Amino acid sequence: SYMPPKAKFTKQQIAEAGLDIIRNEGMENLTARALGKRLGSSACPIFTVFENMEEVQAEINKAARAVYSEYVKKGLKEELAFKGVGTQYIMFAIKEPRLFQLLFMSEQSQQPSVSKVLPVIDDNYEAILLSVQNCYNLSKEKSERLYKHLWIYTHGIAVLCATNMCTFTADEIANMISEVFKGTLKEIIGAEQ
């Protein structure tokens, strides 16, 4: 009897399966075999779509970034977009700890400076920076300084949450970000006078 060839999977389907594996079992369990199994097949069809496992991982990273971007977009809609984004960054770490670890806690191949890290990590960097410049009437340079301080602080909270070392309520997070933001803003504006 004639067996039609198994339907091939799209890059999107393979990436989604990869995200599932990472979410449930962790990055270390992401193998071609595990992907095939998750898709109900062998590993073979994966390599008709991708050249190798590195390409698969790049696509999964892209899919994880898309999930993260949804959080950022939500933050950008808030009245204080800058604070909104910081809060959403932490929410992403709380709700998607393994995707957060994949995107923001993996060792980098080269060590860029912080001002390079932020745009690389965040496609939304320009939008966030503009919201700071406009809301607080700051120069680009001062906005970047403010953003850098806040991002480092926010990243610290997010890492504590993503690794289950600490838990904070939404109110605590909002208050912590506000205090550091106001203090840093005062310092940066005060430096002018």
Where are these regions (language model features)?
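N-terminal intrinsically disordered/low-complexity leader segments
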Residues: 1-9, 192-193
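N-terminal positioning helix adjacent to the helix-turn-helix/winged-helix DNA-binding module
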Residues: 10, 14-17, 64, 146
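Helix-turn-helix
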Residues: 13, 17, 21-55, 59
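Amphipathic alpha-helical linker/stalk segments
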Residues: 58-84, 118, 123-134
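Hydrophobic alpha-helical connector segments
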Residues: 72-99, 147-150
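Short secondary-structure transition hinges
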Residues: 91, 98-130, 159, 163, ...
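Amphipathic alpha-helical packing segments from all-alpha helical-bundle domains
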Residues: 110-137, 144-148, 175-189
